Regions:
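A short, structured active-site edge motif that brings together acidic residues
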Residues: 5, 77-83, 229-246
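Asp-based, Mg2+/Mn2+-dependent phosphohydrolase catalytic module
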Residues: 143-151, 219, 223-231, 246-273, ...
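Conserved GTP-binding G-domain of TRAFAC-class P-loop NTPases and closely related GTPase folds
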Residues: 3, 8, 16, 84-149, ...
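Conserved nucleotide-binding/hydrolysis micro-motifs of P-loop NTPases
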Residues: 31, 80-86, 206-208
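Active-site neighborhood of HAD-like aspartate-dependent phosphohydrolases
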Residues: 145-198
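Conserved substrate/cofactor phosphate-moiety recognition/catalytic segment
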Residues: 5-61
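Substrate-recognition element of Asp-dependent hydrolases with the DxDx(T/V) motif
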Residues: 185-222, 234-241
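Conserved phosphate-donor/acceptor-positioning beta-strand/loop module used by diverse small-molecule
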Residues: 70-90
Length: 299
């Protein structure tokens, strides 16, 4: 029995294991039906790999009971991962299949499904009836085939001064003000560009979801920011509400970064995230990027 979150790599592992052990894979996603329907397919004369999430004691019990009924051994293989890495793998799978990341999870798993699975998960125990439990750490997605490097820039509180604003972000271009002296900021950014980095903005703009400002208002403010800096670079932003998180694009989710990584063949290990908030630091950690605060970056 395989156990693990969605997008933890179970199906890839089960395919390899099936070849090695001459086993039959039972997966409700491919076969259809209910767990009880899968149980009916099990007999004593063959080896089976139960390839579903099998997250809870309750969902595992029906198969353990069947094994006991047939007097056969049942072992568990727990593919250990965290939800954040599973989300990155899910978005990678999405991009490989569709050449696009659907930030709401359309055509694949939504973030809501993954968050729910974390709540449902119960770590497997021998007390459930397994003869053996093997733990395998899930493979962490890397981007070693990409060679370009990037400075990812948060916008509000990093490039723009916002503490004095009512909403803590500008709602019209007249409110846009650079965080530091223009020459200081431009010199620093150009230094990185000359060192071979591209610049890419990533911003949470939940004011759109709250109907405080429009997409056009956000674009106007972003364009004004670049005009004041006198530097051109792409900026992506998430328009969804801050809570509850139902998308892959709101930082610290990795969607905006992955979109840029695939498009520009960026290696995050060679890149830098500059931001002023915890979600910026967390975003960097999830993708193995160096993190810097605005004060450290614009020295």
């Amino acid at each position: 029995m395989l156990i693990g979150y969605p997008a933890s790599g179970k199906s890839t592992y089960s395919s390899e294991l099936a070849k090695e052990t001459n086993s039959i894979i039972l997966n409700r996603d491919t076969i259809g039906g209910t767990l009880k329907d899968l149980v009916k397919l099990i007999n004593k004369d063959k080896n089976y790999i139960l390839d579903n999430t099998n997250l809870s004691i309750k969902t595992r019990k029906i198969f353990i009971d069947k094994a006991n009924e047939l007097n056969i051994e049942i072992n568990a293989i727990y593919i250990k991962s965290n939800i954040e890495d599973c989300m990155i793998r899910c978005m990678n799978r999405m991009y490989q299949k569709h050449s696009k990341i659907y930030f709401d999870g359309e055509n694949d798993l939504s973030p809501v499904v993954l968050f729910k699975s974390r709540k449902e998960f119960e770590e497997p125990s021998l007390d459930e009836g397994f003869k053996e439990i093997k733990i395998i750490n899930a493979h962490k997605l890397e981007f070693n085939n990409f060679n370009n490097k990037c400075v990812f820039l948060d916008i509000d509180g990093t490039l723009r001064k916002t503490d004095h604003l009512i909403n803590k972000y500008p709602i019209k271009k007249e409110e846009v003000e650079l965080l530091f002296d223009k020459d200081k900021m431009k010199t620093t950014l150009n230094k990185y560009v000359n060192d071979g980095y591209m610049l890419y903005g990533v911003s949470n703009q939940s004011g759109i979801g709250k109907n405080i400002l429009s997409v056009d208002d956000v674009i106007d403010c972003m364009n004004e920011t670049k005009r004041l800096l006198d530097i051109e670079f792409p900026i992506s932003f998430c328009s969804h509400n801050s809570f509850p998180i139902k998308c892959y694009c709101r930082k610290p989710q990795s969607g905006l970064f992955l979109e840029a990584i695939y498009k520009y063949e960026i290696n995050p290990f060679l890149s830098i995230m500059v931001g002023d908030r915890t979600e910026d630091k967390t975003s960097a950690k999830r993708l193995n990027m160096k993190y810097m605060t605005p004060n450290d970056f614009f020295i």
